[in-house]
């Protein structure tokens, strides 16, 4: 979004500064709300605790089908943090005067690299270095020289697909909102705000569930190879 539409643009006209400012801001908002929700846990939850419990229960419910109950809970701190952070990073750009950190390819690429490094680390830690990379070659040894480089390229391309999918969608949403605010009064874009909020949630969900899918492929690699 053009600098004139961001409060941070009044302080510094560097786009990197604006993205960094909003990245820190969204992280602080997410951390503050999480602290508030868990500050005094109750049997009968308050509104904020109820929202976070519903969110985490929803993540676990969907993740069970992907990776199983035990591992879904094991990786919940990572995936839950990613889901919440990505949602706030997407949604903050809907507010006039703010810009989505996820509208920057550098930011989404950083998130994708974190996921890429982590799921490969977990795969190596679970199966060992040799066994983990051996499954890239497939069950047929004769095809290993062909399949191994293809699998390596396929895994590396996940960084590109994860980062560009999120970046492209949120950048497009920001451009759409910018045009709406330039052409229509403040009240007219209200339906667009609702749609963009849903899109912010949807993109956070997709990023989160793909993280679980990649983790499942890494830590369950030996089981998949056996079928």
Swiss-Prot record:
Main localization (coarse): membrane
GO CC term (a single one): proton-transporting ATP synthase complex
One GO term (biological process): proton motive force-driven plasma membrane ATP synthesis
UniProt cross-references to InterPro entries, sorted A to Z: ATP_syn_F0_a_bact/chloroplast, ATP_synth_F0_asu, ATP_synth_F0_asu_AS, F0_ATP_A_sf
Pfam families per UniProt: ATP-synt_A
CDD domains the UniProt entry points to: ATP-synt_Fo_a_6
One Gene Ontology molecular-function label: proton-transporting ATP synthase activity, rotational mechanism
PROSITE patterns: ATPASE_A
Keywords per UniProt: ATP synthesis, Cell inner membrane, Cell membrane, CF(0), Hydrogen ion transport, Ion transport, Membrane, Transmembrane, Transmembrane helix, Transport
Transmembrane domains' residue ranges: 17-37, 78-98, 104-124, 176-196, 200-220
The keyword Cell membrane appears for this protein: yes
Membrane topology: Multi-pass membrane protein
Cellular compartment(s): Cell inner membrane
Subunit structure of this chain's protein: F-type ATPases have 2 components, CF(1) - the catalytic core - and CF(0) - the membrane proton channel. CF(1) has five subunits: alpha(3), beta(3), gamma(1), delta(1), epsilon(1). CF(0) has three main subunits: a(1), b(2) and c(9-12). The alpha and beta chains form an alternating ring which encloses part of the gamma chain. CF(1) is attached to CF(0) by a central stalk formed by the gamma and epsilon chains, while a peripheral stalk is formed by the delta and b chains.
Family: Belongs to the ATPase A chain family.
Function field: Key component of the proton channel; it plays a direct role in the translocation of protons across the membrane.
Name of this chain's protein: ATP synthase subunit a
Organism encoding this protein: Wolinella succinogenes (strain ATCC 29543 / DSM 1740 / CCUG 13145 / JCM 31913 / LMG 7466 / NCTC 11488 / FDC 602W) (Vibrio succinogenes)
Name of the gene encoding the protein in the UniProt record: atpB
